[in-house]
């Protein structure tokens, strides 16, 4: 709620954004009982796939990933969007890390799928490496990346790929990489050459991202992704378009960053 409500204040909108608990498989019923005052929703797991199934229209990112994290009321029903892709793209672009020839994605869940689509937008000629423990999900993610025109393959160790990649995107939740981070500590001479985006942001820097910051390399917090995917949602809620910037968007971003930092 902090990001949205901060932005509403800057934009002068008399809107409110609040957290609502909806049970698994209960999203359609919840939406059907709403009055017209409700303009849109952010959707978190495990409801993203349910949202994808019942919306009346979807943006390309939602179609590709099979997941909807944003619902917006329209004249013809509910539109579904995936703004996680935009969040990753903008977080990386604003970090200005240079060319992306090789990108390593850690994980194989919904966020990893969004990361693959984001890589295609950032650098369609990039080679994508996938590291994940679930062999079936890892193979499915590699196949998905290839199906949308990327070069992709699995890797079975982090040491060399993580050092050489221009960008490492960890899509795992906080704490999931603690064991791997400990291994990196034991690998004498581990010196990453590129940047890292860790979607886990509490605490920050994460133990995983610290290996990059200690080497003087760019580290991108999951808060940056969170902020930019929310900016896309705000664009959708205000004028139904994720691509057109908000009025005074620079001031909105500055206010949101200040709120998150404090």
Where in this protein do the model-derived segments appear?
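NAD(P)-binding Rossmann-fold cofactor-contacting core
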Residues: 124-148
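Short, conserved loop/helix-junction motifs that constitute active-site signature segments
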Residues: 97-99, 120-124, 183-193
């Amino acid at each position: 709620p902090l990001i949205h409500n901060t932005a509403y204040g800057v934009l002068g909108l008399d809107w409110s954004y609040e957290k609502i608990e909806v049970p698994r498989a209960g999203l359609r019923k919840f939406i059907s009982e709403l009055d017209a005052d409700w303009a849109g929703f952010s959707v978190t797991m495990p409801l993203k796939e349910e949202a994808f199934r019942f919306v009346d229209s979807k943006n390309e990112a939602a179609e590709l990933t099979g997941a909807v994290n944003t619902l917006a009321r329209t004249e013809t029903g509910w539109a579904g969007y995936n703004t996680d892709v935009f969040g990753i793209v903008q977080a990386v672009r604003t970090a200005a890390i240079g060319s992306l020839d090789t990108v390593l994605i850690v994980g194989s869940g919904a966020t990893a799928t969004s990361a693959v689509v984001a890589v295609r937008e950032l650098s369609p000629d990039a080679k994508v490496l996938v590291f994940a423990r679930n062999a079936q999900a890892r193979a499915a993610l590699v196949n998905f990346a290839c199906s949308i025109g990327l070069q992709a393959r699995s890797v079975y160790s982090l040491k060399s790929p993580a050092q050489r990649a221009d960008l490492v995107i960890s899509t795992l939740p906080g704490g999931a990489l603690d064991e791997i981070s400990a291994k990196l500590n034991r690998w004498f001479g581990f010196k990453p050459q590129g940047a890292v985006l860790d979607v886990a942001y509490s605490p920050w820097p994460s133990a995983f991202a610290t290996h990059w910051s200690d080497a003087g390399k760019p580290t991108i917090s999951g808060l940056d992704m969170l902020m930019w995917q929310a900016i896309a949602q705000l664009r959708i809620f205000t004028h139904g378009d994720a691509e057109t910037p908000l009025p005074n968007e620079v001031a909105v971003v500055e206010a949101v960053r200040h709120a998150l930092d404090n």
